UniProtKB/Swiss-Prot annotation:
Pfam families in alphabetical order: MATH_2
Highest taxon of source: Eukaryota
Keyword Transmembrane helix annotated: no
Listed PANTHER family: PROTEIN RESTRICTED TEV MOVEMENT 3, TRAF-LIKE SUPERFAMILY PROTEIN
MATH domain location: 3-126
Name of the protein in question: MATH domain and coiled-coil domain-containing protein At3g58400
Coiled-coil ranges (or none): 227-285
Assigned keywords, A-Z: Coiled coil
Listed Gene3D superfamilies: Apoptosis, Tumor Necrosis Factor Receptor Associated Protein 2, Chain A
Length: 293
């Protein structure tokens, strides 16, 4: 039986819909935590799940029997939140966890100790009880990811081009940021890319809650020293477009209803006109005396 303890950080990601945390290796398998900061089927709760990473590429028939605990760390005290220990079988179609891990309002509560400086800390502890199928993932290899340094930020290759363009257009964006920890800096930059991606959607695809979340996230990044006036302006533009779109849709529905009523009135009037034409035509017809002469 092999026991492993992994600590994961969600950095300002509490505003996003889904966050997949960095995988860690236990007994030859890569495991990962997936967090749903807005809840998954349980709105208003942090949802947290554990699964074997890249399970679709693993050999046919593999399974892992594991006992695990997921802990939400209170960073201001020793009173962390830890649900009961769970024992389950994992395979390529199953992930286990807690859909209602912890209420979001308590996480966001002032001085709660869970969300500190935009950072939520989660600890996963896993005991492997039984192994079916050989996976053999190297711990040294699996935990290393290729990264690229862009203007002092350690990024994934897929992020580097976008971030380079951001610095070209806004060279002062990170000139006064406070965090020095590379993981925190990477987390902030990932959040920025997510915000840009969100605002790139059409106004119809975004809810008012989405725009409110973006506003809060921008505020968090500005508090960390990022210069994001340009992104705030984009947010206001998108919000205005959404407002104009909704107002236009409302006017259009009202006009369509009026047009429908007018068409109905016209249809009734046309029927009356035809009826009146028939009466006029009958009145103009010559009288017949066949019945009397």
């Amino acid at each position: 039986m092999k026991r492993s303890r992994s600590q994961n950080l969600i950095t300002e990601m509490i505003l996003l819909l889904r966050v997949s945390l960095h995988p860690f290796v236990v007994d030859g398998c890569k495991w990962c935590l997936t967090a749903y900061p807005k809840g998954y089927n349980f709105i208003g709760y942090l949802s947290l799940y554990l699964e074997v990473a890249d399970n679709g590429s693993l050999p046919f028939g593999w399974r892992r029997h594991a006992r695990y605990t997921l802990t939400l760390v209170n960073q201001n005290s020793k009173k962390s939140f830890q649900p009961n220990e769970v024992q389950e079988w994992f395979d390529d179609s199953i992930k286990w966890g807690c859909p209602s891990m912890f209420p979001l309002n308590e996480i966001h509560a002032k001085d709660s100790g869970f969300l500190v400086n935009g950072e939520l800390k989660i600890v996963a502890e896993i005991d492997i009880l039984e192994v079916i199928g050989d996976v053999d993932v190297s711990e040294g290899i699996s935990t290393v990811k290729e990264t690229i340094h862009v203007n002092g930020f350690q990024l994934l290759p897929s992020q580097a081009k976008s971030v380079s363009h951001i610095f070209e257009r806004h060279p002062e964006i990170a000139s006064e940021i406070h965090p020095k920890n590379s993981s925190l800096r990477t987390g902030y930059m990932s959040l920025l890319l997510s915000l840009i991606e969100t605002l790139s959607q059409s106004p119809q695809e975004l809810s008012k809650d989405d725009l409110c979340d973006v506003y809060i996230a921008i505020g968090c990044m500005k508090n960390a020293g990022f210069k994001l006036d340009w992104l705030e302006n984009k947010l206001y533009e998108v919000a205005q477009k959404k407002e104009d779109d909704e107002a236009g849709e409302t006017r259009l529905r009202e006009m369509e209803e009026k047009l429908k009523d007018l068409k109905l009135k016209c249809s009734k009037m046309e029927a009356l006109v035809e009826e009146e034409k028939a009466k006029v035509s009958a009145a103009k017809a010559h009288l017949s005396f066949d019945d009397v002469v």
